């Protein structure tokens, strides 16, 4: 086959990454769409809660929301995440709308804060100038007074620990079979567009389910947009085969099955598949702390 290069038609990818939040080397990228699949009592809630806790301890997240009908039964699991009671949401048909409205409200507050900071800096500059007070526009002084600058000259304080666009993580737990899973609830749309809501503020999502692809499992569009998958012990060969067909990468079915068996051979253990790994060898893990190096990666 002969080829001929055409000058000036090379595609230039955008500089902006799909994952805009910096994370430590061994923590997955954000914003993520995480799916955790495993039987009831298998450890999904504990695993996801621990991952979110790690992000919080690194100062990466500002707020955690939870959609679940069983929070009070599982309070001990989620307590380290310091979830505000107003951010614990029942899995109703309006739950997604509630989440989006909360993210949009945070974005609006951030925008207002940015304006307030600019005006505060202008006020400080004005106060340090030699301009006589009587010569300042009265309407401007009234605006500064309404903002409290005349009574308190200290710099305005943002409501979260770090001044930045709010970083929010949503956990969806024990919600299969509820109104949240109704096609009209907007859940699928949220999972597809999660990085773009509230004018690009975005949100990370962890969705915990008992079945990956069965009738009561995860909708295919959500599976196809997953960035991080946690698979717990599963004795169904049909389910494992289905998962392999969708996410098996360059592994043979036998290699995938052996890797899955190794990753899940301890109580509450699970296999992770990162679809946006920072390095090729970071794609597969046993739990979060052990990388599983595939033959194709090891040989490179």
Give the residues covered by each predicted segment:
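Conserved GTP-binding G-domain of TRAFAC-class P-loop NTPases and closely related GTPase folds
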Residues: 216-300
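Residue-level signal for beta-strand positions within conserved beta-sheet cores that form or flank
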Residues: 60, 201, 268
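N-terminal pre-Walker A segment at the start of P-loop NTPase domains
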Residues: 1-23, 71
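Conserved P-loop
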Residues: 41-130
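A structural signal for isolated positions on well-ordered beta-strands in alpha/beta enzyme cores
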Residues: 65, 204-206, 271
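Conserved P-loop NTPase motor cores
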Residues: 20-24, 31-54, 69-73, 124-254
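A generic secondary-structure signal marking the coil-to-beta-strand transition
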Residues: 32, 63, 168, 268-269
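Phospho-regulatory, low-complexity terminal regions
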Residues: 1-11, 37-44, 113
């Amino acid at each position: 086959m002969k080829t001929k290069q055409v000058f000036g038609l090379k595609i230039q990818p955008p500089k902006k990454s799909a994952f805009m939040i910096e994370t430590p080397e061994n923590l997955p990228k954000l914003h993520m769409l995480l799916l955790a699949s495993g039987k009831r009592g298998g450890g999904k809630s504990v695993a996801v809660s621990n991952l979110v806790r790690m992000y919080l301890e690194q100062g990466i997240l500002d707020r955690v929301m939870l959609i679940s009908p069983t929070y009070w039964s599982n309070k001990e699991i989620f307590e380290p995440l310091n979830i505000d009671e107003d951010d614990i949401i029942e899995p109703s048909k309006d739950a997604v709308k509630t989440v989006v409205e909360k993210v949009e409200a945070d974005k609006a507050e951030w925008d207002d804060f940015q304006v307030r900071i600019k005006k505060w800096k202008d006020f400080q500059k004005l106060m340090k100038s030699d301009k006589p007070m009587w010569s300042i526009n009265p309407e401007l002084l009234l605006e500064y007074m309404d903002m409290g600058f005349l009574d308190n000259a200290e710099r305005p304080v943002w409501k979260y620990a770090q001044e930045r666009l709010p970083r929010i993580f949503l956990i969806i737990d024990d919600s299969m079979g509820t109104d949240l899973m109704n096609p009209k609830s907007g859940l699928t749309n949220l999972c597809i567009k999660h990085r773009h809501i509230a004018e690009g503020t975005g949100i990370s999502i962890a969705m915990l389910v008992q079945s990956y692809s069965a009738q009561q499992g995860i909708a295919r569009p959500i599976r196809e947009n997953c960035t991080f998958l946690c698979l717990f012990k599963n004795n169904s060969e049909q389910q494992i085969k289905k998962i392999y067909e969708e996410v098996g990468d360059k592994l043979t079915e036998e290699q995938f099955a052996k890797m899955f068996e190794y990753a899940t051979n301890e109580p509450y253990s699970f296999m992770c598949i990162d679809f946006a790994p920072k390095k090729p060898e970071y794609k597969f893990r046993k739990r979060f702390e052990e990388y599983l190096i595939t033959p194709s990666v090891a040989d490179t």
